[in-house]
């Protein structure tokens, strides 16, 4: 007789840049959470759905927890903390190569107040010596009674099958919330805007990245050629940032568009014509109505 089907929700939390999105994308096998080496890349809860014949795990990739500097930062931390209460299991991801930091201490204090089981995932184990890993495990074991401590490499996939096995063991009997072939509950527009924002994050520097929102103005399909025309606007806070994103003779914007188009075509499996505009909206991160316009709705979180 076959085992009953299990399902549950798992939150992935940790300081910015510890590899949370890399882990989610490795498990799901398709890029759905944007990755960059700049902190605070993930803004909205991105849900990845991992389904096998035995179970379904719905992953929530929260923003990196940090002390907020503005309304958007405050909003991002609020999402992460609220998530702790809503899920069946928490993955607390740390970066083995940087060791214990004050940001980790901040998160552990929050985790001690929740009833949800917590797995400590020590990521980037390929970057440290085994004896340093053992010391790190002991250090964290003294700080909190974790349900499991699992060393992994999200980038290379080391020990990820074991992590999924342990996760399944912690799930309750439950329904299949999403169809078997669905990997995220975000609409295509959201993922397209995130893929464009990823290229802005990777290609620009300094103050520009965190001052960027991307709005998809329209998507049209040509019925004859099946080609998609996507119109997008990149929102920045200052005209100097607009200049950086457009670049000399429009070269930077061209690069952003070209790289984003390839990612979007890979995601959608069809040819895309991508048109991008850049618009200045002063201090949008501190204005509640702009946050809502650009997809950050407090009510949903």
Curated annotation (Swiss-Prot):
Region feature (G5): 152-154
Region (G2): 40-44
UniProt xrefs under PROSITE patterns: G_ERA, KH_TYPE_2
Chain spans, region G4: 123-126
Domain (Era-type G) ranges: 6-173
KW Lyase (keyword) present: no
Listed GO biological process terms: ribosomal small subunit assembly
Compartments, as annotated in UniProt: Cytoplasm; Cell membrane
Gene Ontology CC, one term: cytosol
Cited function: An essential GTPase that binds both GDP and GTP, with rapid nucleotide exchange. Plays a role in 16S rRNA processing and 30S ribosomal subunit biogenesis and possibly also in cell cycle regulation and energy metabolism.
Family statement: Belongs to the TRAFAC class TrmE-Era-EngA-EngB-Septin-like GTPase superfamily. Era GTPase family.
Protein name: GTPase Era
Organism for this UniProt entry: Listeria monocytogenes serovar 1/2a (strain ATCC BAA-679 / EGD-e)
Gene: era
């Amino acid at each position: 007789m076959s085992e009953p089907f299990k399902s549950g929700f798992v939150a992935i939390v940790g300081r910015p840049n510890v590899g949370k999105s890399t882990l989610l994308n490795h498990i799901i096998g398709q890029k759905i959470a944007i990755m960059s080496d700049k902190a605070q890349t993930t803004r909205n809860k991105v849900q990845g759905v991992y389904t096998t014949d035995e179970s379904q795990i719905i992953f929530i990739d929260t923003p990196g927890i940090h002390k907020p500097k503005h309304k958007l930062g405050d909003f991002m931390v609020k999402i992460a903390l609220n998530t702790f209460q809503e899920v069946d299991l928490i993955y607390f991801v740390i970066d083995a190569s940087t060791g214990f930091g004050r940001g980790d201490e901040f998160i552990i204090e929050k985790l001690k107040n929740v009833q949800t089981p917590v797995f400590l995932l020590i990521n980037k184990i390929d970057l440290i010596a085994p004896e340093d890993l053992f010391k790190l495990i002991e250090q964290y074991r003294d700080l909190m009674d974790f349900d499991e401590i699992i060393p992994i490499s999200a980038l290379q996939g080391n020990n990820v099958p074991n992590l999924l096995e342990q996760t399944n063991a912690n799930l309750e009997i439950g329904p299949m919330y999403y169809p078997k072939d669905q990997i995220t509950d975000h609409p295509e527009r959201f993922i397209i805007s995130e893929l464009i924002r990823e290229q802005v994050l990777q290609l620009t520097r300094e103050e520009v990245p965190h001052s960027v929102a991307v709005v998809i103005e329209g998507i049209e399909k040509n019925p004859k050629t099946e080609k998609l025309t996507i119109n997008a606007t990149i929102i920045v806070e200052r005209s100097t940032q607009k200049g950086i994103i457009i670049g000399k003779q429009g070269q930077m914007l061209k690069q952003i568009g070209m790289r984003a188009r390839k990612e979007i075509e890979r995601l959608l499996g069809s040819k895309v014509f991508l048109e991008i505009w850049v618009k200045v909206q002063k201090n949008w991160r501190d204005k509640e109505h702009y946050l809502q316009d650009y997809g950050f709705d407090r009510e949903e979180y």
